[in-house]
């Protein structure tokens, strides 16, 4: 007997709004008609709909955040949709054209990302989804729980990974938090028995990360004080007032070390008041842009010297030289330069230049926004999986093909190499320590071609050594 439209609507609403919904219910559909069965939502004989979630940058500008002129919603979108255009021009994927469906949220109001989940799963359902960075992990999990394959360039909690539909570049917040704290303890940065503060948000990724970090700290005999900032309410002013108050909380607890599990957009108040306390900072790569070049340049000078263990790579070497790019990274840069040729007045992309910016270096060289690695990595993996899934495309056949890819390329991360196999929901295989390094505007280029070790005269993360470590799951 055919399923009623009313019952179908009820299932869709439950899947989209309930993060504990069972995947068996969420992955069924009236559109199940592929040759081998499975969910074919967003797929026709001639097309595949892929959702592209990007932040509406008008909200950030309205809130007073200074953004580079070329950093626009449209330009963010085409960093992904341009790959679809390229595939389509070459004949599509197994005879189908890929249609990008752009969905936006207001980054000043994180809860507006609920509409992205609603649209992707109910209103204008797509076959699969991409968010290269920035969207709240709560809403990434909402989409994954509804049985939609989703790629995410930032860090999500393990519960989102456990849906089986999420693929990230980095491991879960819990894995990153534990590995970061364990490394800090092993290196002596966090001494046994020391008083340790944790600066965190209250999103699911933050809460999960703090729980994992506390497990390792408690085993090390550390006294722990947590300052939790309300990141879910979305007002940067309130968040930064709360993070500023955390300074006094940590002073009262006589902490010597602080683990940072809070993104820069909510922690500026803390950094404005953190200087002069002789605290050691360990950054946990558990939230948006924590240990990326954009996150590094956005932190206040008082954060300089902090250490982060991250899968994300760098444009420089520990001995202060520009890092040679892999063949894949060169390909990513060439595609971005071709895409953005009219956005930066002819200035080529250059390692370390903040997203959307055009910059004149102290030696007079004019350069522009670095090539974005996440978009290149994700679309490359997605294309390979779509091709491998064949003509009888369903969400299930796509995920099986994706998990069976084996070795994959990663731009500016995991020492260039990642992997996919059954049960592995993230791409990276390696992690390494990086140190936040000062390079204020006007810093002179040194004899090795960098600016106090940074690729340009912008504060950056510099690797502390050449060794990459296997990720401990």
Where are these regions (language model features)?
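C-terminal motif of bacterial Sec signal peptides marking the signal peptidase cleavage site
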Residues: 21-25
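Bacterial signal peptide processing site
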Residues: 27-29
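Beta-alpha junction/loop-to-helix N-cap segments that form part of ligand/metal-binding clefts
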Residues: 31, 36-38, 89-164, 168-171, ...
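N-terminal extracellular/periplasmic Venus flytrap/periplasmic-binding protein-like
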Residues: 35-119
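Solvent-exposed, acidic/polar segments of extracytosolic/periplasmic ligand-binding ectodomains
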Residues: 41, 406-473
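Periplasmic-binding protein-like
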Residues: 52, 120-134, 151-154, 195-200, ...
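Extracellular/periplasmic Venus flytrap/periplasmic-binding protein
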Residues: 166-277
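Extracellular/periplasmic periplasmic-binding protein-like sensory domains
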Residues: 274-376, 464-468
């Amino acid at each position: 007997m055919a399923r009623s439209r009313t019952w179908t609507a009820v299932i869709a609403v439950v899947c989209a709004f309930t993060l504990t919904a069972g995947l068996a219910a969420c992955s069924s559909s009236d559109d199940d008609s592929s040759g081998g069965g499975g969910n074919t939502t967003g797929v026709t004989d001639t097309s595949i709909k892929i959702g592209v979630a990007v932040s509406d940058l008008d909200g950030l500008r309205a809130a007073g955040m200074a953004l580079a002129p070329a950093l626009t919603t449209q330009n963010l979108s085409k960093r992904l949709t341009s790959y679809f255009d390229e595939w389509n021009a070459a004949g599509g994927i197994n005879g189908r054209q890929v249609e990008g469906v752009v969905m936006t949220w207001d980054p000043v109001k994180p809860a507006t990302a609920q509409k992205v989940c609603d649209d992707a799963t109910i209103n204008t359902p797509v076959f699969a989804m991409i968010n290269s960075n920035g969207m709240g992990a709560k809403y990434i999990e909402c989409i994954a729980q509804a049985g939609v394959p989703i790629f995410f360039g930032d860090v999500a909690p393990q519960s989102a990974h456990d849906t089986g539909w999420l693929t990230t570049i980095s491991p879960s917040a819990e894995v990153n938090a534990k590995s970061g704290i364990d490394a800090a303890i092993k290196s002596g940065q966090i001494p046994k028995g020391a008083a340790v503060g944790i600066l965190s948000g209250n999103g699911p990724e933050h809460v999960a990360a703090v729980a994992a970090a506390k497990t390792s700290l408690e085993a090390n005999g550390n006294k722990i004080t947590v300052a939790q900032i309300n990141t879910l309410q979305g007002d940067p002013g309130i968040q930064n007032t709360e993070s500023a108050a955390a300074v006094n909380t940590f002073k009262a607890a006589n902490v010597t070390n602080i683990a940072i599990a809070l993104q820069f957009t909510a922690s500026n108040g803390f950094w404005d008041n953190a200087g002069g306390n002789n605290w050691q900072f360990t950054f946990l790569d558990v939230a948006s842009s924590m240990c990326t070049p954009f996150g590094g340049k956005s932190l206040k000078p008082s954060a300089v010297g902090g250490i982060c263990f991250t899968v994300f790579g760098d444009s420089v070497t520990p001995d202060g030289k520009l890092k040679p790019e892999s063949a894949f990274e060169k390909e990513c840069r060439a595609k971005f330069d071709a895409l953005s040729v009219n956005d930066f007045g002819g200035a080529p992309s250059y390692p370390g230049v903040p997203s959307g910016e055009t910059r004149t270096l102290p030696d007079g060289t004019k350069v522009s926004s670095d090539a974005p690695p996440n978009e290149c990595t994700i679309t490359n993996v997605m294309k390979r999986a779509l091709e491998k899934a064949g003509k009888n495309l369903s969400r299930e056949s796509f995920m099986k093909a994706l998990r069976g890819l084996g070795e994959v390329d990663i731009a500016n991360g995991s020492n260039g190499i990642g992997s996919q196999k059954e049960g592995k929901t993230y791409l990276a295989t390696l992690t390494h320590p990086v140190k936040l390094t000062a390079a204020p505007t006007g810093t002179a280029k040194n004899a090795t071609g960098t600016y106090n070790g940074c690729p340009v005269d912008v504060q950056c993360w510099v690797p502390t050594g050449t060794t990459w470590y296997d990720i401990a799951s």
